[in-house]
Amino acid sequence: MVALSPAACEELGIQLSEEDRKKPYIEMSGRKGLGVKADDLINRLEEDALTEVATRHPQLSVEEQSATAHEIAVGALRYFLLKFTRNSVIAFDFKEALSFEGETGPYCQYAAVRANSIFRKLDENALNSANELIGKVGSDKDISAKVGEALAGEAGTEIWALIMLAQRLDEVIAQCAAAAEPANLAKYTFNLARAFNLFYHRHRIIAEEDRTRQAVLIATADIARRQLTAALATLGISVPERM
């Protein structure tokens, strides 16, 4: 069942009684004349997202700001609706849906935007060079040893965990299809975004001076961003160029 939070009702101009304002959610009811169109939600989300985008990126043209706001709004709504299991009450709330923190579409989109920004700042051949170096593991003893060192300890364990999580995408999609439960994919996408953000904050990918270690970090970031982008696309959510 889809409902609205009292705050969302007020934002949409739906009049509520004092009793309704105290409820956790307001059920939509045609009989009572309470209803909302998806377009109304998108339009309101776009307005709020545009304000944030214009503040963060005043250098963008109006058209670019509007396009970015639309992508964020659609991502926010789709993720919010998909993150709940089929038998749950979906109490839509604008502030919660558009938050850049927590289990939201914008949070997942922002993680992918961050990942893409890494590769815009790196040399255009950095990824190919990293993959070429990693490809020598097993045939070159020195490189194998250095890669092993880069993947040792707690940091290495976290890198492996991110890689293994990213590689589970196909498995998760298959499970969701079998169970007809897209909420599982939404949860996986959030977990992958959160794992990447942790990786992003703990490692100096662009500034890393050790060539082998940087190659490991670049390869890991690429795997994570490709799988995160694919997971979002499966949910019908695109990744803006900037957020």
Predicted regions and their residues:
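Non-catalytic interaction-recognition regions
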Residues: 1-243
